[in-house]
Amino acid sequence: MTRPRPVVLIIMDGWGIAPPGPGNAADLADTPHVDAWMANCPFTTLGASGLDVGLPEGQIGNSEVGHLNIGAGFVVYQELTRISKAIADGDFFTNPVLLQAIEHVKQRNSALHLMGLFGPGGVHAHEDHLHALLELAHRHHLQRVYLHLFLDGRDVLPRSALGFLDTLEGVIARLGVGTIATVSGRYYAMDRDKRWERTGRAYAALVDGVGEKAPSARAAIEASYARDVSDEFVLPTVIVTASGEPTATVRDGDAVIFTNFRPDRGRQLTRAFVDPDLNERIRQHYERQKAEGQPLPATIWQRERQLRDLCFVTMTQYEEGLPVLVAFPPRYVTNPLAAVISQAGLRQFHIAETEKYPHVTFFLNGGREEPFPGEDRQLIPSPKVATYDLKPEMSAPEVTEALLAAIDSDQYDFIVVNYANPDMVGHTGSIPAVIKACEAVDAGLARVVPAILERGGVALVIADHGNAEQMIDPETGGPHTAHTTNPAPCFLIGGAGYGKDAIELRHGGRLADVAPTLLELLELEPSPDMTGQSLIVRRA
């Protein structure tokens, strides 16, 4: 049988598998093409959370972890598990980079600032790591330790911060160290889409003590709830003393430890602190936006001055070349899927819109920034809207057009595309919008799959984790905006020789089995470190 060309991996981001129900937007959506392929083509489900992707048991999956496992071809030991294991083993408390930050403030009699996403969400950060840093500060008898909490409400319930605050206040009371200085919704502190006006508001609270004011973190959160503002969108708020002064701000000579272990939403705020060329970078970004006819914010934020003698530690590497210290440096996947394809002399094409572009490039390629030889990439800009329920189709039509052009060019042996809609719209909690998001993906695939088949190619359609299939929280009955532990779909669409009569996809698989499956379709041998197994079982 002739090798199929192109082999296309289609990732329906956040489209998990769950029983039908009023909160299963993926099932409620009118998706005749996806429904037919799931019913009539070789189909299975894949483990996409917990131990299946190198996370703690029961931990929800996410896009970074998912794409890393998909590309690696083996279960990748995730940073959450890696850091938590270091805490359990005691290695965390002798980490040389963390100790360097401790020594920095001791020598200068300055302050240590701990900032990051707050709570047990486990996608970007985990409260256990913050608690361990407080324990470290306690062991070294630090007095001036300030916390800057970025409220979640997305990977956890929308209004869950007060419960996490109870836990944190208990830890602070037990250890006798730590004072909360600011709180901010992740919408501001963790923007990743170059909306610098949001980052600027978070930075102003952290460094200048400018923003909303509240006498305590609890008061700040309760005031936001009273205005019907959930955790994710809490305005950057400065906790003030009885005299109205900021409890603490980040100053020259201080040390900062950014507790996020996932890179993508930590980069922008980190740049605000450490990038010497920040203002020029921001200016050029908005000049490009203006030239492209895109709307500009009412005011363009610029950093007034860069802090001096600042020891800035990130828990993991957020980006190559950032002038920071890294507590847990990367351990690269050396031979990911893209490398094997490149080494075979084949051409490949990676495409997604902005929100998922790092996932089909950096994460899929094992943490490598640069493309491999023979690898082309295309970034489709995500729409500039406040939240994606306002435009649930996002940029799926534009992704589809560019993908069709790549298929029609007949240049590529392998193509990977990510449709961001089910996940990004899923995070808004709006069931009608998520239904439209899933329908937008179905409409795109209705055009893409026939083009693949016409050229003698095959499509392997998967998800990287669940989200859209569970929009109602089973405990509260309210909106569920987080990822899930549900399995991901996996189905193979091809011509003669690839139907149910010739092939089945084995059960019990996980995301790490996707790369070996694709390499079998490409008639290539997996790299020696790929311990995943092809899902394809050929019938006799």
Curated annotation (Swiss-Prot):
GO biological process, one term: carbohydrate metabolic process
Record EC number: 5.4.2.12
UniProt-listed InterPro entries: Alkaline_phosphatase_core_sf, BPG-indep_PGM_N, Metalloenzyme, PGAM_B_sf, Pgm_bpd_ind
UniProt keyword Manganese, yes or no: yes
Keyword Manganese annotated: yes
Family affiliation: Belongs to the BPG-independent phosphoglycerate mutase family.
Protein name in the entry: 2,3-bisphosphoglycerate-independent phosphoglycerate mutase
Organism: Chloroflexus aurantiacus (strain ATCC 29366 / DSM 635 / J-10-fl)
